[in-house]
Amino acid sequence: MARLYYDADANLDLLSNKTVAIVGYGSQGHAHALNLRDSGVKVVVGLYPGSKSAESARLEGLTVTSVAEAAEVADLIMILLPDEVQKTVYQQEILPHLKPGKVIAFAHGFNIHFAQVVPPADVDVIMVAPKGPGHLVRRTYTQGEGVPCLFAVYQDASGQARDRAMAYAKGIGGTRAGILETTFREETETDLFGEQVVLCGGLTALIKSGFETLVAAGYQPELAYFECLHEVKLIVDLIVEGGLAKMRDSISNTAEYGDYTRGPRIITDETRREMEKILYEIQTGQFAREFVLENMSGKAGFTAMRRREAEHPIEEVGKDLRAMFSWLSKR
């Protein structure tokens, strides 16, 4: 069984008298920067000129500079930018300032694993990937807790890359919850697979198909929305808290029986074969090449898909229903 590492296993002193550059100040960026700062680490935030996030970072008392300036002064550079822009920013703003002994870090292995970013041989290359959104990484830290993280070493030029990755994970609160060692390849391929087959692609396709089936059969769209989308969170919360067993222990016998007898008719052997094809596309780099080329060509197809999905009837029904949820408007 995989081992989890905790506070006692990591040495935050490895970051003392060091400067950490956080490149990007979005969901993960703001959480990493603030948590490290509150852990006693010297932090500088690197942003492009005119970034709307600069003022937010300054209001938190953080030092904000250009990406190039941050990369120049930092000992450890954590890149927390969208996958599709990392290569350009790295080549133009970061690479010229990478000196022997520095550390370049990522929260996802995409650009390293698929060779979009190829660091020089004399720097450490590490990954620390919180398994939760940035607001949760920050909130749990302020509560004295943390979000579990994955960590990995791609290149160990200093002989301390692993310890440095664990120290960084401790600085953002990860070792409070537990951190799990992996590789860039394993994290990248499993993360993409989970997103495409289950969490995003699979789930949204299932929700829409269920909604469309009920509406086509003459049921009210509002009821279809409740049954196929709204209640997903209620079920997922139970699964997260105690696995599939707790969920099944919490639902009615009718629902549980339907789970066992009808679920396998939805996820069939044909579905599993398609899952295997998608995994193969990830492993061979086919998906990565497709995604990179889509962005290089201006994202016309991506933009069209976004527009089409935004116009799906479930979105309009959901918008009207959510406006009536008093408990939701208070969040």
UniProtKB/Swiss-Prot annotation:
Residue pairs linked by disulfide bridges in the UniProt entry: none
Domain KARI N-terminal Rossmann: from-to ranges: 2-182
Residues the entry annotates as binding NADP(+): 25-28, 51, 53, 83-86, 134
GO cellular component: cytosol
KARI C-terminal knotted domain ranges (all copies): 183-328
Cofactor comment: Binds 2 magnesium ions per subunit.
InterPro entries assigned: 6-PGluconate_DH-like_C_sf, KARI, KARI_C, KARI_N, KARI_prok, NAD(P)-bd_dom_sf
MF annotations from Gene Ontology: ketol-acid reductoisomerase activity; magnesium ion binding; NADP binding
UniProt superkingdom: Bacteria
Binding site for Mg(2+) 1: 191, 195
Pathway info: Amino-acid biosynthesis; L-isoleucine biosynthesis; L-isoleucine from 2-oxobutanoate: step 2/4; Amino-acid biosynthesis; L-valine biosynthesis; L-valine from pyruvate: step 2/4
Function recorded in the entry: Involved in the biosynthesis of branched-chain amino acids (BCAA). Catalyzes an alkyl-migration followed by a ketol-acid reduction of (S)-2-acetolactate (S2AL) to yield (R)-2,3-dihydroxy-isovalerate. In the isomerase reaction, S2AL is rearranged via a Mg-dependent methyl migration to produce 3-hydroxy-3-methyl-2-ketobutyrate (HMKB). In the reductase reaction, this 2-ketoacid undergoes a metal-dependent reduction by NADPH to yield (R)-2,3-dihydroxy-isovalerate.
Recorded family membership: Belongs to the ketol-acid reductoisomerase family.
Record's protein name: Ketol-acid reductoisomerase (NADP(+))
Native species: Cyanothece sp. (strain PCC 7425 / ATCC 29141)
Encoding gene (name): ilvC
